């Protein structure tokens, strides 16, 4: 999978491709924050050669002004849920799996980013409180937060119980609370 971005009239656009399970090349393009459109190509046109496909994609979209998104412009978003114990319970594990899957789909299909992982454990401020943290990397902080809220609400994943915090991707300091 390869993803490129470009700014056009103060709007951020994305273009990405991947190879489907059916051996089709899927090219997905759109304005960041929207689902965009897909185009299917037959992978056999590329002689099963990933480099040839990557060159085709890069050539096509770089001519239109698309480039890699610099990591200095990325954001970490952490979605936090309270847990009742350090080990968590069945609900916590279910919530972790469902929220991670749905958020990864939501962020990916809208060109916003992806889920990078999760952790479950004690809070930094109070060792007697426990949380599930889901870490997301996004290209636009505000659109990412809005997409996360909308997704968790739509799929009824304890939306009213979350906190969302943010920090620049390249910054190694504290997160700043954005929503609770």
Give names to the regions the model predicted:
Residues 1-6:
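Short, hydrophobic/aromatic-rich segments at coil-to-beta transitions
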Residues 34-48, 132-138:
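A short, exposed loop/beta-hairpin motif centered on an aromatic-Gly-Thr core
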Residues 56-98:
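Surface-exposed beta-loop interaction hotspot
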């Amino acid at each position: 999978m390869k993803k490129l971005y470009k700014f056009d009239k103060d709007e951020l656009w994305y273009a990405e491709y991947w190879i489907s399970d059916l051996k089709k090349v899927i090219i997905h393009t759109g304005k960041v924050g929207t689902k965009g459109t897909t185009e299917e190509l037959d992978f056999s046109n590329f002689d099963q050669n990933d480099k040839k496909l990557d060159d085709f994609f890069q050539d096509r979209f770089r001519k239109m002004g698309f480039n890699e998104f610099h990591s200095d412009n990325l954001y970490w978003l952490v979605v936090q849920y309270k847990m009742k114990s350090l080990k968590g319970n069945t609900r916590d594990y279910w919530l972790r799996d469902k929220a991670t899957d749905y958020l990864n789909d939501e962020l990916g299909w809208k060109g916003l980013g992806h889920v990078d992982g999760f952790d479950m454990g004690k809070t930094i401020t109070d060792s007697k409180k426990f949380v599930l943290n889901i870490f997301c990397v996004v290209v636009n902080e505000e659109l990412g937060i809005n997409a996360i809220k909308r997704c968790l609400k739509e799929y009824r994943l304890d939306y009213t119980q979350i906190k969302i915090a943010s920090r620049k991707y390249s910054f190694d300091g504290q997160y700043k609370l954005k929503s609770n």
